[in-house]
């Protein structure tokens, strides 16, 4: 009798512990597509040209279409006719993944100065680009980016050759 009770009790316990939770699973794929990195290379520099400056400075703007505009109240800044020194916007080549759009970041006002190597400087402000703030890479994965700006010429600016650098950044959107 004791054996029957033990067997009956064991069967009862097996029945209690035999219930299992029902589960379900699914499978997902993982993937990645590697694209060409975006890159920018300078093709030509921003050139304001040769300037004659008197007592009153002014602003010399170079558009992305290489158009020179001189402004400022009473300015005596001018470009000698026939000897302007080929003013031109900077040109950059952009390469990357075909058809992708990219953002263009230009220097902010006050961030760029050019110097004659001594203590004389001029600010370069008002940077503009073509395309504007966003470009699109061609089917070949290329684009041309032009950058113009405005040179702030001081009163009685000391003669000399002034140079400096500026950065243009491109990144995928």
Show the residue positions of the predicted features.
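Bacterial N-terminal signal peptides that target proteins for export
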Residues: 1-7
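N-terminal small/polar-rich segments of proteins
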Residues: 19-106, 111, 139-173
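Acidic, glycine-rich flexible loop segments
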Residues: 120-151
């Amino acid at each position: 009798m004791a054996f029957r009770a033990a067997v009956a009790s064991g069967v009862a316990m097996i029945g209690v512990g035999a219930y299992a939770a029902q589960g379900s699973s699914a499978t997902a794929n993982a993937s990645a597509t590697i694209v060409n990195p975006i890159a920018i290379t300078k093709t030509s520099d921003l050139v304001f040209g040769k300037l004659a400056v008197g007592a009153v400075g002014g602003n010399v703007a170079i558009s992305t279409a290489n158009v020179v505009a001189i402004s400022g109240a009473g300015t005596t800044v001018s470009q000698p006719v026939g000897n302007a020194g080929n003013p031109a916007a900077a040109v950059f080549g952009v390469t990357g993944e075909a058809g992708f759009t990219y953002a263009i970041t230009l220097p902010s006002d006050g961030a760029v100065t050019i110097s004659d190597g001594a203590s004389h400087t001029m600010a370069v402000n008002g940077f503009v680009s073509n395309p504007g703030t966003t470009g699109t890479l061609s089917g070949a994965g290329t684009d041309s980016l032009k950058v113009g700006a405005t040179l702030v010429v001081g009163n009685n600016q000391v003669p000399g050759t002034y140079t400096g650098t500026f950065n243009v950044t491109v990144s995928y959107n």
